[in-house]
């Protein structure tokens, strides 16, 4: 799973996920399913934000990479991926500037057009169950919730999906592709139900005895097929800016 994550996701996404896990004392090399889940969630947050701007009239517009957008303001502020101290600093700044209510939990994004924080969810289960879990945890009508699944389903607060259909379809397609790539490598079942996978692995190890004449070393080389996986497609200009901003914050 670790090799898959490093080949499948943008290097900046992988780096931010590693830093987030280490901040909580978790090891990406051991908790590989969580590593994959965090990378997926980060990618969805970035894709949610990509190419969405606010023009001088305060209207939301979509500008593709390469178009002049120096005078445009990004519609979404990305909070997810920052260390906790910096993330709360950003949240406090937004609240002081806009007057919105401060959330009890760190949200993932802030929407400058709708003036609300957004909690993004990516689930391997049914969307309505995960939505209710998020809502019960947050317990705030001020934070907008938007849940995506790997099967193409989604659910949002008051059925307000924020983004246009094409932007949401791009996210759904990416999630479905991740699922298909995992399944083709036999990783999907353990990703969906990691506890059962661990129990089955322990059971298999107890039943198996070492066989004479069989190789005992495991190859860690990346297969040629895995090397062909393209990383996440992202606005290259914003990727560079985000990398500089996020990593600068991490060093402080």
Swiss-Prot record:
Gene3D superfamilies: Influenza RNA-dependent RNA polymerase subunit PA, endonuclease domain (3.40.91.90). Keywords: Decay of host mRNAs by virus, Eukaryotic host gene expression shutoff by virus, Host cytoplasm, Host gene expression shutoff by virus, Host mRNA suppression by virus, Host nucleus, Host-virus interaction. This is Protein PA-X. Belongs to the influenza viruses PA-X family. It is found in: Host cytoplasm; Host nucleus. The probable endonuclease active site in the N-terminus and the basic amino acid cluster in the C-terminus are important for the shutoff activity. The C-terminus acts as a nuclear localization signal. The C-terminus is recruited to host protein complexes involved in nuclear Pol II RNA processing. The active site is at 80, 108. Plays a major role in the shutoff of the host protein expression by cleaving mRNAs probably via an endonuclease activity. This host shutoff allows the virus to escape from the host antiviral response. Hijacks host RNA splicing machinery to selectively target host RNAs containing introns for destruction. This may explain the preferential degradation of RNAs that have undergone co- or post-transcriptional processing. InterPro entries: PA/PA-X, PA/PA-X_sf. One of its GO terms (molecular function) is RNA binding. It comes from Influenza A virus (strain A/Grey teal/Australia/2/1979 H4N4). The record marks 202-203, 206 as: Important for efficient shutoff activity. The gene is PA. The record marks 195, 198-199 as: Important for efficient shutoff activity and nuclear localization. GO terms for biological process: viral RNA genome replication; viral translational frameshifting.
């Amino acid at each position: 799973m670790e090799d898959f994550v490093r080949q499948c996701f943008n290097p900046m996404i992988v780096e931010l996920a590693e830093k987030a896990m280490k901040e909580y004392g978790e090891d990406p090399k051991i908790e590989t399913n969580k590593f994959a889940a965090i990378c997926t969630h980060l990618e969805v947050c970035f894709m949610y934000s990509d190419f969405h701007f606010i023009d001088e009239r305060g209207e939301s517009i979509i500008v593709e990479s390469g178009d002049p957008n120096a005078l445009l303001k990004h519609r979404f502020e990305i909070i997810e991926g920052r260390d906790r101290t910096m993330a709360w600093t950003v949240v406090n700044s937004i609240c002081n500037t806009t007057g919105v209510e401060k959330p009890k939990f760190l949200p993932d994004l802030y929407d400058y057009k709708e003036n609300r924080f957004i909690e993004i969810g990516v689930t391997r289960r049914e969307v309505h169950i995960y939505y209710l879990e998020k809502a019960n945890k947050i317990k705030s009508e001020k934070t907008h919730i938007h849940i995506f699944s790997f099967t193409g389903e989604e659910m949002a607060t008051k059925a307000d999906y924020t983004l246009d259909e094409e932007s949401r379809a791009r996210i759904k397609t990416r999630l479905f592709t991740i699922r298909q790539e995992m399944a083709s490598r036999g990783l999907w079942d353990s990703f969906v139900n990691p506890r059962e996978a661990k129990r089955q692995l322990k059971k298999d190890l107890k039943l198996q005895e070492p066989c004479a004449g069989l190789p005992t070393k495991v190859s860690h080389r990346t297969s040629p097929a895995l090397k062909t996986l393209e990383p996440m497609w992202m606005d290259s200009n914003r990727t560079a800016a985000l990398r500089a901003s996020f990593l600068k914050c991490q060093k402080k």
